[in-house]
Structures are given as structure tokens and as C-alpha cells.
Amino acid sequence: MPMTLGYWDIRGLAHAIRLLLEYTDTSYEDKKYTMGDAPDYDRSQWLSEKFKLGLDFPNLPYLIDGSHKITQSNAILRYLARKHNLCGETEEERIRVDILENQAMDTRIQLAMVCYSPDFEKKKPEYLEGLPEKMKLYSEFLGKQPWFAGNKVTYVDFLVYDVLDQHRIFEPKCLDAFPNLKDFMGRFEGLKKISDYMKSSRFLSKPIFAKMAFWNPK
């Protein structure tokens, strides 16, 4: 029986999950909820189901796999990763995975706070000023390894790919000074299942955020 992934009809927090589902060749339904337009941003399509799905903490995204009903995007990623041994194999690798999962979410939230802010035009230059230092830390952490935990793909590569790609859309030159990050992005996009997915009609790269965001390329 296929899994069900529920989320808004945007990229948002589901992008890394969708990528991981595709990479692992998992059968799933990508259930997309539509939000209304301004000024109300009607959410009734989701709210009408929110408390009927048996979720402990009803929220989007959610993943339903038989009796397993999971919310929180990183909990979903970890669940899928455990099924496919993509959590790191050594203690050192798992430590790197744990660190990077949290670091990537911090970076994601920092960008989102700028993009959802009514003061976006004021905050954007400030954010761009600090961006090279952020990218430098990711570059140094990756080093000469092909993947962020080491020699094998783990679920945080999906998370970091998404976060770096969002920043690449936000500021197209932000990775230019970091060849290893650019190589990582190309290596990830070159994975057969990922490449096939990105060429398919199922692939959703934009919009990144919900409709109330002040920066949200279509």
C-alpha cells in the first residue's frame, strides 16, 4: 500500500522528503492541499481534514505509512532514512548527520524569516551580507568528501541540498566561491533517481514558500 505524504502545494518543508521518497523508489501519494489567495489565505482544504487523520500533533507535512502516522518534517526524513540505512553507519557519521540536520534547519528558518518579513527589502541586504560566512561553514564541513557524512549518501544530503538550492535561487552567485558545494549540488542532481524525478511532471521546485511570503518566486 503506498505511503501518503500530505503538504501544501508548494516546495516548502516537503521538498527534501519528496526527494528522499523518489531516491528510495518508494510508492507514495503526494497529497497536496491548496491555500486560498490574499487577504484571507483560506486553509479550509487542510483544516477540514486536520483532526480526522489520527495524527498525534496534526500539522503539515505528514506521512502515513500503514499504522505509522508521522508529523514533523525531520521525523519523517529520519523514518524514511532508517528504512533504507541512510542515517550514517559509524558513530562519527551519525554525529555529523545530527549536527548538520539541526544546522540546516537553522539556516532554513533564517532565510524564511527574511522572506516572510514585511521588512523584506530592508532585511535582504543584511542577510546577503552574512551569507558568504554561512556558506563557508558548510563548505568547510563538507571538505573533500563527496557527501556531508562521508563517502555515502545520508538523509541530511537531501536536507542540505534543499537549503543550499533555496539560497542559490535567492542569490544565484552564493556558491560561486565554494567549488566543493557546487560539486555537491551537481553530484546530488546527477543521482539517477533524482535526475529522473527532476525531469518529470511530478517535480515541484517552486513556489518555495506559502502565498503570504514577500519573496516567493513562482
Swiss-Prot record:
Enzyme Commission designation: 2.5.1.18
Domain of life, source organism: Eukaryota
Main location class: cytoplasm
The UniProt record lists the keyword Lipid metabolism: yes
Binding positions (glutathione): 7-8, 43-46, 50, 59-60, 72-73
Alphabetical keyword list: Cytoplasm, Lipid metabolism, Phosphoprotein, Transferase
Gene Ontology annotations of biological process type: hepoxilin biosynthetic process
GO molecular function: glutathione transferase activity; identical protein binding
Start and end residues of each GST N-terminal domain: 2-88
Catalysed reactions, as listed in the record: RX + glutathione = an S-substituted glutathione + a halide anion + H(+); 11(S)-hydroxy-14(S),15(S)-epoxy-(5Z,8Z,12E)-eicosatrienoate + glutathione = (11S,15S)-dihydroxy-14(R)-S-glutathionyl-(5Z,8Z,12E)-eicosatrienoate
Residue positions where Phosphoserine is found in the record: 27, 44, 117
Residue stretches making up the GST C-terminal domain: 90-208
Entries under Gene3D superfamilies matching the protein: 1.20.1050.10, Glutaredoxin (3.40.30.10)
Residues that, per the record, bind substrate: 116
Example of a GO cellular component annotation carried by this entry: mitochondrion
Entry's localization field: Cytoplasm
Entries under CDD domains matching the protein: GST_C_Mu, GST_N_Mu
InterPro entries reported in the protein's UniProt record: Glutathione-S-Trfase_C-like, Glutathione-S-Trfase_C_sf, Glutathione_S-Trfase, Glutathione_S-Trfase_N, GST_C, GST_mu, GST_superfamily, Thioredoxin-like_sf
Complex and partners: Homodimer.
PANTHER family reported for this sequence: GLUTATHIONE S-TRANSFERASE, GLUTATHIONE S-TRANSFERASE MU 2
Biological role: Conjugation of reduced glutathione to a wide number of exogenous and endogenous hydrophobic electrophiles. Participates in the formation of novel hepoxilin regioisomers.
Sequence similarity: Belongs to the GST superfamily. Mu family.
Name of the protein: Glutathione S-transferase Mu 2
Naturally occurring in which organism (per UniProt): Mus musculus
